[in-house]
C-alpha cells in the first residue's frame, strides 16, 4: 500500500546524504521519497558568499513548499542534525498561517541538547565559541574552487567521530581482517561499504558551523524560545513551535545513542504544545545506538515499519499520487552552498526547480 510522500532532510554534519542510502532504500518500498544533499563548502567559490544556519531553515521551507506545489502535501523526516532547523522551518510556516506538512518525524536529534548530555554536548558546553573559531576553522587551500573560504574541515569531523569510539572501530577492522582470512566475502563487503560512506566527509561553511554550535549546543535558543531566524527578505522571525497545530509529530530515539542523548529528541513534544496529544507519538528503539535508528536490521525490521504506519495514519486522502518508482531532479540555486534535491518518486518529468544548501 502506498503510504505517502516524504521529504528526508539529510544531516549537514560532515557526511553526504549517501550515509542514508539504507534509509532511503527501505522507505522507497512504500513511499515517494525526496532527499536533500548538501554541497561540499570547499567546492563553492568564495565570491558566492557565505552560508548560515538561517539559510538552512529557509531552504527547508522552500523544499516543503516546492513539493506541496508540485506533488501535494508531504511528510518530513529529519535525521540527527536537521531536526532543529526542520522544526524551526515548520514552526515559521505555521506562525505565518501556511500549509504545514502532514507529519514530521524527528530521529536522534539535539532538540534539547541539555538532556542526557553526551561527549558531543559536553565539548560544546565546556569550550567557548571563540575556542571553536580559533581551533577548528581553516581556510580552503588554493587547489579547490572554494579557495580562501572559511570552513570546518570534514577531516576534523571524521577524526572526532572515530575518537568517540576508538575501540569499536578497532574491533570492526580486526573483524574485517578475520573475515578476509576466513574467506567470508559477504561480511567483508558489508564492512567496506559502511566505511566507504563513513570515511567520505565534506567541509562545512564556518558561519553555519559556528552558528549551529552557539544556537543549538550553547545557548539552546530553540528550547528557550529566543531563536530569531532571518527570512529571505531580511526580517527576523521568532521560532514558535507551539504554533504548529496541523502537523503530526513522531520522535525516534535509540536506547544507546551516544551522539544525541536520551530525551533530547523527545523534548520536541513539550515544545509542540499546539499539536493534539493523539497526534503525537514517541518511539524508543531498544538496543539501538545512533546509527541503528536509520540503518541496519533494527531500522529495517522495527523503525521503518513504525514510521510508515505513522505516516499512513496521517495521510491526506486528497493527495494520493501514484505508487513510487524513481526520478532524479537537480535543483539549481542562486546562493553559495546550494544543494541537490534527489527525488525518488513516480516516473515523470518535471520542469520545477527550487533552491537549497547544508550531515550524522
Q: For the regions a protein language model found, what residue spans apply to each?
A:
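Short, surface-exposed "cap/lid" segments of acyl-processing enzymes
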Residues: 3-44
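Conserved acidic catalytic loop of the alpha/beta-hydrolase fold
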Residues: 43-46, 57-74, 86-87
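Alpha/beta-hydrolase-fold enzymes
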Residues: 69-72, 85-207
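Gly/Ala-rich beta-loop-alpha elbow adjacent to hydrolase catalytic centers
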Residues: 78-86
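Short beta-strand/loop motif that positions the catalytic acidic residue
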Residues: 245, 251-253
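Conserved alpha/beta-hydrolase "acid-adjacent" motif
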Residues: 258-264
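Catalytic histidine neighborhood in serine/cysteine hydrolases
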Residues: 272-290
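Catalytic histidine-centered segment of alpha/beta-hydrolase-like enzymes
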Residues: 287-301
Amino acid at each position: 500500500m502506498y503510504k505517502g510522500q516524504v521529504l528526508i532532510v539529510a544531516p549537514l554534519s560532515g557526511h553526504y546524504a549517501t550515509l542514508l542510502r539504507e534509509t532511503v532504500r527501505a522507505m522507497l518500498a512504500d513511499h515517494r521519497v525526496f532527499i536533500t544533499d548538501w554541497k561540499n563548502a570547499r567546492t563553492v567559490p568564495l565570491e558566492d558568499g557565505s552560508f548560515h544556519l538561517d539559510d538552512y531553515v529557509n531552504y527547508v521551507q522552500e523544499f516543503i513548499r516546492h513539493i506541496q506545489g508540485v506533488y501535494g502535501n508531504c511528510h518530513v523526516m529529519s535525521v540527527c542534525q536537521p531536526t532543529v532547523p526542520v522544526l524551526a522551518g515548520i514552526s515559521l510556516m505555521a506562525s505565518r498561517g501556511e500549509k504545514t506538512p502532514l507529519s514530521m518525524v524527528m530521529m536522534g536529534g539535539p532538540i534539547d541538547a541539555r538532556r542526557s548530555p553526551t561527549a558531543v554536548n559536553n565539548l560544546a558546553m565546556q569550550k567557548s565559541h571563540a575556542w571553536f573559531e580559533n581551533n577548528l576553522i581553516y581556510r580552503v587551500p588554493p587547489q579547490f574552487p572554494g579557495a580562501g573560504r572559511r570552513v570546518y574541515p570534514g577531516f576534523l569531523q571524521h577524526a572526532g567521530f572515530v575518537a568517540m569510539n576508538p575501540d569499536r572501530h578497532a574491533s570492526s577492522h580486526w573483524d574485517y581482517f578475520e573475515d578476509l582470512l576466513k574467506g567470508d566475502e559477504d561480511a567483508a563487503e558489508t564492512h567496506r561499504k559502511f566505511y566507504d560512506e563513513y570515511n567520505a566527509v565534506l567541509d562545512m561553511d564556518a558561519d553555519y558551523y559556528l552558528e549551529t554550535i552557539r544556537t543549538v549546543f550553547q545557548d539552546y535558543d530553540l528550547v528557550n524560545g529566543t531563536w530569531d531566524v532571518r527570512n529571505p527578505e531580511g526580517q527576523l522571525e521568532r521560532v514558535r513551535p507551539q504554533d504548529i497545530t496541523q502537523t503530526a509529530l513522531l520522535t525516534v530515539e535509540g536506547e544507546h545513542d551516544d551522539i544525541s542523548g536520551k530525551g533530547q529528541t523527545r523534548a520536541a513534544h513539550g515544545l509542540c504544545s499546539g499539536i493534539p496529544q493523539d497526534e503525537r507519538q514517541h518511539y524508543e528503539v531498544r538496543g539501538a545506538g545512533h546509527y541503528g535508528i536509520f540503518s541496519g536490521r533494527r531500522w529495517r525490521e522495527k523503525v521503518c515499519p513504525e514510521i510508515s504506519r505513522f505516516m499512513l495514519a496521517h495521510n491526506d486522502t486528497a493527495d494520493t499520487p501514484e505508487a513510487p518508482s524513481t526520478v532524479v531532479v537537480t535543483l539549481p540555486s542562486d546562493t553559495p552552498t546550494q544543494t541537490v534535491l534527489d527525488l525518488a518518486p513516480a516516473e515523470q518529468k518535471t520542469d520545477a526547480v527550487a533552491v537549497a544548501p547544508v550531515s550524522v
